[in-house]
């Protein structure tokens, strides 16, 4: 039987569509249904590697995990990774097809519609419910004739639409009514209910507004979802990153981690596990004076290493980071950050830049050569030497014992090759890629152990390694070690917390009627 569908659209970006979809995936999964997420086209710099080596938006990987299914490229058949100047790398069914200007990309929409329809069809054949996420707003009237992600998909899937608005930013009633006013009659008819998201306060005070909203539009309110604090679920939207730049400085007993906020930052969810650790303050910085007395400086991934390296030099951060590292300051680079910490960076084919070559910061003995072949893989690895950062043995993979002890997981997403030179020590020894044995060495460690680079995203998601790193940082500062391991919820516990809050806020009977579950 073909799967039922439900679609979450929003009045704007960052109203909570991705998390609402993740909640619905977990809600339906807990009822014993086979659930899959779907987003036809995603524009994001946070991406994820599927087991078969495809690249999809991070949000759909999160939603798949919430649904307890393996992420596949059909869940996000088109991914756009912005490169600047109205250009994006276009990834179709997990593979890059090139970099296109927005005007050129729109010429492909007919072909993309067919690809999207086939992906959606495969998901519907294999599952009971498909939870579909829209993008931005369906009321972008200047783009409506090019739509392949909002009402076009709702029609193709015959999906009822839940229209979400963010009350925390203000103006939610105007946003919902205004969106409905700009939709075509057939599109308005497809909107089955409203969801008010991120509510704080007394619901009784909101109820008159909800009644007026339904009276004006004829659309019921499915529920009012509370503002949920400190969810350990990866963000995708750059809007969420903006808020995290304005963090208070670390207190006397807290660890201070400074993340360089590169203009083209990508996969910045690499640092989220650090943000959720007690006694740790993560700051995003853009100026040399903001480094302060940071215990760790982290250079994250970037969509354009060459361009962001030029920005790093122009901002003065390159010199400041290098000077600090040469004095023994601990520094970590992930993916593009690893490349920047190295020496020669070559781009003879113009994969990333018109510049054929550049020099990194010279803190690691690695050489980078960009090539058109893209590496996308889930990996399993171990520490290659005595330590991850600091003196040998200071940081390890944790205290686990038995089969799999010391094994780390993550994923690679990068163009070209990064190789060690001059006998540099590797950071990690990869054992497998994509579930297949493929031994290789990754990254590099400086001679004094103060600087480490790796091409593996998600490495700090490994609890043992992360906590060992934080313990070493505390010891270096003379701070007491944490009293035992903090009780940090697992991601699945967080999906349940999210689902519990959303399910308690929605009219279940109405939701079942909208989706069609009352008839099955």
Curated annotation (Swiss-Prot):
Q: Any keyword Ligase? A: no
* Active site, renumbered: 335 (nucleophile), 457
CDD domains reported for this sequence? CobQ_N (cd05389), GATase1_CobQ (cd01750)
Q: Fetch the InterPro entries from UniProt.
A: Class_I_gatase-like (IPR029062), CobQ/CobB/MinD/ParA_Nub-bd_dom (IPR002586), CobQ_GATase1 (IPR033949), CobQ_N (IPR047045), CobQ_synth (IPR004459), GATase_3 (IPR011698), P-loop_NTPase (IPR027417)
Q: What is this protein called?
A: Cobyric acid synthase
**Could you tell me which cysteines form disulfide bridges?**
none
The organism encoding this protein is Sorangium cellulosum (strain So ce56)
At the top level of its lineage, which domain of life is listed? Bacteria
């Amino acid at each position: 039987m073909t799967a039922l569908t439900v679609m979450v659209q929003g009045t704007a970006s960052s109203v909570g569509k991705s998390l609402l979809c993740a909640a619905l995936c977990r809600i339906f999964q807990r009822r014993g249904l086979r659930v899959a997420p779907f987003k036809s086209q995603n524009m994001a710099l946070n991406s994820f590697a599927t087991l078969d080596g495809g690249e999809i938006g991070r949000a759909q990987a999160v939603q798949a995990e919430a649904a307890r299914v393996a992420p596949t490229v059909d869940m996000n058949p088109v991914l756009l990774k912005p490169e600047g100047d109205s250009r994006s790398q276009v990834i179709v069914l997990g593979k890059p097809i090139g970099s296109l200007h927005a005007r050129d990309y729109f010429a492909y929409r007919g072909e993309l519609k067919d690809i999207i329809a086939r992906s959606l069809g495969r998901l519907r054949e294999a599952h009971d419910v498909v939870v579909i996420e829209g993008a931005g707003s369906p009321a972008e009237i200047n783009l409506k004739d090019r739509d392949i992600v909002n009402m076009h998909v709702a029609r193709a899937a015959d999906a009822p639409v839940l229209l979400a608005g963010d009350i925390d930013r203000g103006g939610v009633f105007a946003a919902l009514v205004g969106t409905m006013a700009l939709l075509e009659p057939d599109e308005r008819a497809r909107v089955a209910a409203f969801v008010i998201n991120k509510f704080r306060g007394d619901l009784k005070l909101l109820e008159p507004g909800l009644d007026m909203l339904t009276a004006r539009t004829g659309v019921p309110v499915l529920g009012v979802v509370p503002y949920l604090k400190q969810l350990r679920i990866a963000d995708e939207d750059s809007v969420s990153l903006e808020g995290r730049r304005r963090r208070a400085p670390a207190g006397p007993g807290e660890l201070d981690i400074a993340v360089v906020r590169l203009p083209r930052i990508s996969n910045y969810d690499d640092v989220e596990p650090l943000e959720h650790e007690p006694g740790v303050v993560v700051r995003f910085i853009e100026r040399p004076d903001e480094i302060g007395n940071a215990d760790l400086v982290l250079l994250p991934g970037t969509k354009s290493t060459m361009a962001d390296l030029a920005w790093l030099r122009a901002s003065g951060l390159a010199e400041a980071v290098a000077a600090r590292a040469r004095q023994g300051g601990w520094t970590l680079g992930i993916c593009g950050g690893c490349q920047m910490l190295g020496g020669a960076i070559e781009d003879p084919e113009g994969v990333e830049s018109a510049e054929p070559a550049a020099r990194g910061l010279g803190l690691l003995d690695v050489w980078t050569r960009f090539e058109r072949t893209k590496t996308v893989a889930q990996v399993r690895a171990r520490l290659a030497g005595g330590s991850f950062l600091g003196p040998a043995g200071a940081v390890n993979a944790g205290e686990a014992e038995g089969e799999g002890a010391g094994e780390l997981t993550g994923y690679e997403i990068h163009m070209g090759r990064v190789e060690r030179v001059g006998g540099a020590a590797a950071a990690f020894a990869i054992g497998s890629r994509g579930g297949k044995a493929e031994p290789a060495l990754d990254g590099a460690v400086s001679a004094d152990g103060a600087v480490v680079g790796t091409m593996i995203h998600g490495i700090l998601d490994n609890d043992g390694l992360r906590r060992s790193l934080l313990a070493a940082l505390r010891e270096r500062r003379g701070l007491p070690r944490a009293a035992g391991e903090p009780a940090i919820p697992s991601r699945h516990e967080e999906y349940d917390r999210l689902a519990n809050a959303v399910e308690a806020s929605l009219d279940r009977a109405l939701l079942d009627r909208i989706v069609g579950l009352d008839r099955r």
